[in-house]
Amino acid sequence: MARTGIRIKGPRAASEELHEAIIVGGSYAGLSAGLQLARARRRILIVDAGLRRNRFVSQAHGFLAQDGRSPDEILHDARKQLLEYGTVTFLRATATEAAGSMNDFRITTDRGDSHRGMRLLLATGLKDELPAIPGLDERWGTTVFQCPYCHGYELNRGRIAVIATGASAYHHAAMVADWGEVALFTNGAVDLDDEQERHLKDRGVVIERERVLRVSGATTIELRDGRSEPFAGIFTAARTSLASDLASLVGCELEDGHFGQHIKADRFGQTSVSGVFACGDGTGMAGSIAVAVSSGATAAVGLHRSLVFA
Protein backbone atom coordinates (compact mmCIF):
# COMPACT_ATOMS: atom_id res chain seq x y z
CA MET A 1 0.00 0.00 0.00
CA ALA A 2 1.14 3.54 -0.64
CA ARG A 3 1.91 5.55 2.43
CA THR A 4 -0.02 8.79 2.64
CA GLY A 5 2.21 10.57 5.17
CA ILE A 6 0.99 13.55 7.16
CA ARG A 7 -1.06 15.97 5.13
CA ILE A 8 0.07 19.57 5.55
CA LYS A 9 -2.45 22.28 4.80
CA GLY A 10 -1.86 26.00 4.48
CA PRO A 11 -3.36 28.48 6.91
CA ARG A 12 -7.13 28.94 6.81
CA ALA A 13 -7.47 26.20 4.23
CA ALA A 14 -10.89 24.62 3.84
CA SER A 15 -11.35 21.09 2.59
CA GLU A 16 -14.57 20.22 0.78
CA GLU A 17 -13.56 16.57 0.66
CA LEU A 18 -16.18 14.56 2.50
CA HIS A 19 -14.45 12.03 4.72
CA GLU A 20 -16.45 9.02 5.76
CA ALA A 21 -15.26 9.58 9.32
CA ILE A 22 -13.35 12.26 11.18
CA ILE A 23 -11.60 11.05 14.31
CA VAL A 24 -10.66 13.78 16.76
CA GLY A 25 -7.87 12.51 18.98
CA GLY A 26 -4.94 10.47 17.73
CA SER A 27 -3.82 8.70 20.87
CA TYR A 28 -4.40 5.00 21.62
CA ALA A 29 -8.20 4.92 21.33
CA GLY A 30 -8.31 7.16 18.26
CA LEU A 31 -5.58 5.30 16.38
CA SER A 32 -7.15 1.96 17.26
CA ALA A 33 -10.46 3.15 15.84
CA GLY A 34 -8.65 4.48 12.79
CA LEU A 35 -7.02 1.13 12.12
CA GLN A 36 -10.33 -0.73 12.09
CA LEU A 37 -11.92 1.83 9.77
CA ALA A 38 -8.88 1.88 7.48
CA ARG A 39 -9.07 -1.89 7.20
CA ALA A 40 -12.71 -1.45 6.20
CA ARG A 41 -11.33 0.75 3.38
CA ARG A 42 -13.07 3.86 4.66
CA ARG A 43 -11.75 7.37 4.03
CA ILE A 44 -10.83 8.85 7.39
CA LEU A 45 -9.19 11.96 8.78
CA ILE A 46 -7.49 11.85 12.18
CA VAL A 47 -6.95 15.21 13.89
CA ASP A 48 -4.61 15.17 16.86
CA ALA A 49 -3.14 17.90 19.07
CA GLY A 50 -0.35 15.68 20.44
CA LEU A 51 -1.35 16.01 24.10
CA ARG A 52 -2.02 12.44 25.15
CA ARG A 53 -3.07 11.95 28.75
CA ASN A 54 -0.11 9.75 29.73
CA ARG A 55 2.55 12.01 28.18
CA PHE A 56 4.31 12.28 31.57
CA VAL A 57 4.91 8.52 31.79
CA SER A 58 8.16 6.92 30.59
CA GLN A 59 6.97 3.30 30.44
CA ALA A 60 3.65 1.69 29.58
CA HIS A 61 2.50 -1.46 31.35
CA GLY A 62 -0.36 -3.92 31.14
CA PHE A 63 -0.64 -3.81 27.34
CA LEU A 64 -0.06 -7.22 25.80
CA ALA A 65 3.25 -7.53 23.85
CA GLN A 66 4.13 -3.89 24.66
CA ASP A 67 4.84 -4.15 28.40
CA GLY A 68 7.58 -1.77 29.51
CA ARG A 69 7.85 0.12 26.23
CA SER A 70 7.81 3.89 25.96
CA PRO A 71 4.30 5.23 25.25
CA ASP A 72 5.88 7.53 22.65
CA GLU A 73 7.33 4.54 20.81
CA ILE A 74 4.02 2.69 20.89
CA LEU A 75 2.21 5.67 19.38
CA HIS A 76 4.94 6.28 16.80
CA ASP A 77 4.76 2.70 15.57
CA ALA A 78 0.95 2.69 15.59
CA ARG A 79 0.79 5.89 13.55
CA LYS A 80 3.40 4.62 11.10
CA GLN A 81 1.47 1.40 10.52
CA LEU A 82 -1.84 3.23 10.17
CA LEU A 83 -0.47 5.64 7.57
CA GLU A 84 0.40 2.68 5.35
CA TYR A 85 -3.31 2.54 4.54
CA GLY A 86 -4.04 4.79 1.61
CA THR A 87 -7.40 6.02 2.89
CA VAL A 88 -5.95 7.63 6.04
CA THR A 89 -4.99 11.28 6.51
CA PHE A 90 -3.38 12.52 9.72
CA LEU A 91 -3.48 16.19 10.69
CA ARG A 92 -1.49 17.67 13.61
CA ALA A 93 -3.87 20.32 14.94
CA THR A 94 -6.38 21.05 17.68
CA ALA A 95 -10.03 20.74 16.73
CA THR A 96 -11.71 23.81 18.23
CA GLU A 97 -15.21 23.70 16.77
CA ALA A 98 -17.64 21.02 15.67
CA ALA A 99 -21.13 21.23 14.20
CA GLY A 100 -23.47 19.46 11.83
CA SER A 101 -25.64 16.38 11.71
CA MET A 102 -25.69 12.87 10.31
CA ASN A 103 -23.73 12.63 7.03
CA ASP A 104 -22.52 16.23 7.20
CA PHE A 105 -20.37 17.14 10.19
CA ARG A 106 -17.77 19.87 10.06
CA ILE A 107 -14.83 20.48 12.37
CA THR A 108 -12.58 23.54 12.49
CA THR A 109 -9.03 23.53 13.81
CA ASP A 110 -6.76 26.09 15.44
CA ARG A 111 -4.98 26.36 12.07
CA GLY A 112 -8.14 27.73 10.47
CA ASP A 113 -8.78 24.54 8.49
CA SER A 114 -12.28 23.13 8.25
CA HIS A 115 -13.07 19.54 7.35
CA ARG A 116 -16.23 17.60 6.59
CA GLY A 117 -17.17 14.09 7.58
CA MET A 118 -20.16 11.77 7.38
CA ARG A 119 -19.46 10.56 10.92
CA LEU A 120 -17.61 12.08 13.86
CA LEU A 121 -15.66 10.02 16.39
CA LEU A 122 -14.51 11.78 19.54
CA ALA A 123 -11.40 10.27 21.12
CA THR A 124 -10.49 13.49 22.87
CA GLY A 125 -9.72 12.09 26.32
CA LEU A 126 -9.61 13.64 29.75
CA LYS A 127 -7.57 16.14 31.74
CA ASP A 128 -6.39 15.24 35.23
CA GLU A 129 -6.90 17.72 38.06
CA LEU A 130 -4.73 16.84 41.05
CA PRO A 131 -5.32 17.87 44.66
CA ALA A 132 -3.89 21.29 45.51
CA ILE A 133 -0.90 19.85 47.34
CA PRO A 134 2.48 21.40 46.48
CA GLY A 135 4.76 18.87 44.79
CA LEU A 136 2.13 16.59 43.27
CA ASP A 137 1.84 18.13 39.79
CA GLU A 138 5.53 17.98 38.92
CA ARG A 139 5.76 14.33 40.00
CA TRP A 140 2.63 13.18 38.19
CA GLY A 141 3.43 10.14 36.08
CA THR A 142 6.93 9.68 37.52
CA THR A 143 6.48 8.95 41.23
CA VAL A 144 2.83 9.99 41.70
CA PHE A 145 0.26 7.78 39.98
CA GLN A 146 -3.39 6.81 39.82
CA CYS A 147 -3.47 3.29 38.33
CA PRO A 148 -1.77 0.52 40.34
CA TYR A 149 -2.09 -1.92 37.44
CA CYS A 150 0.02 0.44 35.34
CA HIS A 151 2.64 1.40 37.94
CA GLY A 152 2.30 -0.66 41.12
CA TYR A 153 4.51 -3.62 40.24
CA GLU A 154 7.65 -1.53 39.78
CA LEU A 155 7.42 -0.28 43.39
CA ASN A 156 8.63 -3.74 44.47
CA ARG A 157 6.23 -4.05 47.41
CA GLY A 158 7.72 -0.99 49.08
CA ARG A 159 5.90 1.61 51.16
CA ILE A 160 3.08 3.24 49.21
CA ALA A 161 1.09 6.34 50.11
CA VAL A 162 -2.50 6.84 49.01
CA ILE A 163 -3.68 10.45 49.30
CA ALA A 164 -7.47 10.65 49.52
CA THR A 165 -9.48 12.94 47.27
CA GLY A 166 -12.92 11.54 48.10
CA ALA A 167 -14.90 8.45 49.06
CA SER A 168 -13.11 6.34 46.42
CA ALA A 169 -9.97 6.47 48.58
CA TYR A 170 -11.25 3.51 50.60
CA HIS A 171 -11.36 1.31 47.51
CA HIS A 172 -8.11 2.76 46.17
CA ALA A 173 -6.18 1.99 49.36
CA ALA A 174 -7.66 -1.49 49.74
CA MET A 175 -6.68 -2.35 46.17
CA VAL A 176 -3.20 -0.83 46.27
CA ALA A 177 -2.40 -2.96 49.33
CA ASP A 178 -1.68 -5.84 46.93
CA TRP A 179 1.34 -3.88 45.66
CA GLY A 180 3.00 -2.83 48.92
CA GLU A 181 2.66 -1.53 52.47
CA VAL A 182 0.02 1.18 52.25
CA ALA A 183 -0.57 4.29 54.32
CA LEU A 184 -3.86 6.05 53.55
CA PHE A 185 -3.75 9.80 54.14
CA THR A 186 -7.40 10.78 54.56
CA ASN A 187 -6.46 14.48 54.29
CA GLY A 188 -9.94 15.61 55.32
CA ALA A 189 -11.38 14.18 52.09
CA VAL A 190 -12.96 10.93 53.29
CA ASP A 191 -14.82 9.73 56.38
CA LEU A 192 -14.37 6.01 56.89
CA ASP A 193 -17.02 4.02 58.71
CA ASP A 194 -16.11 1.30 61.22
CA GLU A 195 -16.48 -1.52 58.71
CA GLN A 196 -14.23 0.21 56.18
CA GLU A 197 -11.60 0.87 58.82
CA ARG A 198 -11.65 -2.78 59.89
CA HIS A 199 -11.29 -3.93 56.30
CA LEU A 200 -8.38 -1.59 55.63
CA LYS A 201 -6.59 -2.69 58.79
CA ASP A 202 -7.14 -6.33 57.80
CA ARG A 203 -5.47 -5.43 54.50
CA GLY A 204 -2.50 -4.00 56.40
CA VAL A 205 -3.35 -0.38 55.57
CA VAL A 206 -2.23 2.28 58.05
CA ILE A 207 -4.75 5.12 58.34
CA GLU A 208 -3.19 8.58 58.77
CA ARG A 209 -5.49 11.54 59.48
CA GLU A 210 -2.89 14.30 59.73
CA ARG A 211 -3.08 16.75 56.82
CA VAL A 212 -0.56 16.50 53.98
CA LEU A 213 1.43 19.72 53.70
CA ARG A 214 3.51 18.98 50.60
CA VAL A 215 5.45 16.34 48.68
CA SER A 216 9.22 16.79 48.52
CA GLY A 217 12.25 14.89 47.25
CA ALA A 218 11.26 11.94 45.10
CA THR A 219 8.32 10.71 47.19
CA THR A 220 8.49 12.16 50.69
CA ILE A 221 5.23 13.31 52.23
CA GLU A 222 5.52 16.19 54.68
CA LEU A 223 2.71 16.49 57.22
CA ARG A 224 1.32 19.52 58.96
CA ASP A 225 2.55 18.31 62.36
CA GLY A 226 6.15 18.36 61.12
CA ARG A 227 6.61 14.67 60.35
CA SER A 228 8.12 13.52 57.05
CA GLU A 229 7.39 10.06 55.63
CA PRO A 230 9.36 8.58 52.70
CA PHE A 231 7.60 6.25 50.25
CA ALA A 232 8.42 4.20 47.17
CA GLY A 233 5.47 5.74 45.36
CA ILE A 234 2.33 7.80 45.83
CA PHE A 235 -1.15 7.13 44.48
CA THR A 236 -4.02 9.58 44.32
CA ALA A 237 -7.29 9.71 42.40
CA ALA A 238 -7.29 12.82 40.25
CA ARG A 239 -10.52 14.58 39.43
CA THR A 240 -11.05 14.66 35.68
CA SER A 241 -12.65 16.89 33.08
CA LEU A 242 -13.13 16.48 29.36
CA ALA A 243 -10.03 17.58 27.46
CA SER A 244 -12.21 19.10 24.72
CA ASP A 245 -15.63 20.74 24.62
CA LEU A 246 -16.46 19.29 21.17
CA ALA A 247 -18.96 16.82 22.65
CA SER A 248 -20.96 19.67 24.15
CA LEU A 249 -20.68 21.72 20.96
CA VAL A 250 -22.36 19.00 18.90
CA GLY A 251 -24.97 18.38 21.61
CA CYS A 252 -23.78 15.11 23.14
CA GLU A 253 -25.22 14.20 26.51
CA LEU A 254 -22.70 14.02 29.34
CA GLU A 255 -22.95 12.01 32.55
CA ASP A 256 -21.29 12.09 35.94
CA GLY A 257 -18.71 9.46 36.80
CA HIS A 258 -16.70 8.75 39.93
CA PHE A 259 -14.11 11.44 39.17
CA GLY A 260 -15.87 13.85 36.83
CA GLN A 261 -18.09 14.13 33.77
CA HIS A 262 -17.65 12.03 30.66
CA ILE A 263 -19.43 11.51 27.35
CA LYS A 264 -22.44 9.23 27.55
CA ALA A 265 -22.12 6.46 24.96
CA ASP A 266 -23.38 2.92 24.48
CA ARG A 267 -21.11 -0.12 24.24
CA PHE A 268 -20.41 0.61 20.56
CA GLY A 269 -19.58 4.24 21.23
CA GLN A 270 -22.81 5.76 19.92
CA THR A 271 -23.51 9.01 21.76
CA SER A 272 -26.87 10.73 22.19
CA VAL A 273 -26.32 12.45 18.82
CA SER A 274 -26.86 10.36 15.69
CA GLY A 275 -23.63 9.98 13.75
CA VAL A 276 -21.39 11.04 16.64
CA PHE A 277 -19.39 8.33 18.36
CA ALA A 278 -16.96 8.44 21.26
CA CYS A 279 -14.29 6.18 22.70
CA GLY A 280 -11.42 6.07 25.18
CA ASP A 281 -10.99 7.79 28.52
CA GLY A 282 -13.52 10.47 27.60
CA THR A 283 -16.32 7.89 27.82
CA GLY A 284 -15.49 6.96 31.40
CA MET A 285 -13.32 3.95 30.58
CA ALA A 286 -10.50 2.94 32.90
CA GLY A 287 -7.36 4.91 32.09
CA SER A 288 -5.09 2.29 30.54
CA ILE A 289 -3.70 1.79 27.05
CA ALA A 290 -5.17 -1.70 26.77
CA VAL A 291 -8.67 -0.51 27.63
CA ALA A 292 -8.35 2.54 25.35
CA VAL A 293 -7.33 0.38 22.39
CA SER A 294 -10.27 -1.96 22.99
CA SER A 295 -12.67 0.97 23.30
CA GLY A 296 -11.45 2.49 20.04
CA ALA A 297 -11.75 -0.75 18.11
CA THR A 298 -15.28 -1.34 19.41
CA ALA A 299 -16.43 2.20 18.60
CA ALA A 300 -15.03 1.83 15.08
CA VAL A 301 -17.19 -1.23 14.55
CA GLY A 302 -20.23 0.72 15.70
CA LEU A 303 -19.38 3.62 13.40
CA HIS A 304 -18.74 1.32 10.45
CA ARG A 305 -22.08 -0.41 10.94
CA SER A 306 -23.80 2.97 10.97
CA LEU A 307 -22.29 3.73 7.56
CA VAL A 308 -23.42 0.39 6.17
CA PHE A 309 -26.92 0.34 7.61
CA ALA A 310 -27.78 4.06 7.59
PLM regions: where:
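Beta1-alpha1 glycine-rich phosphate/pyrophosphate-binding loop at the start
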Residues: 19-73, 158-159, 164-190
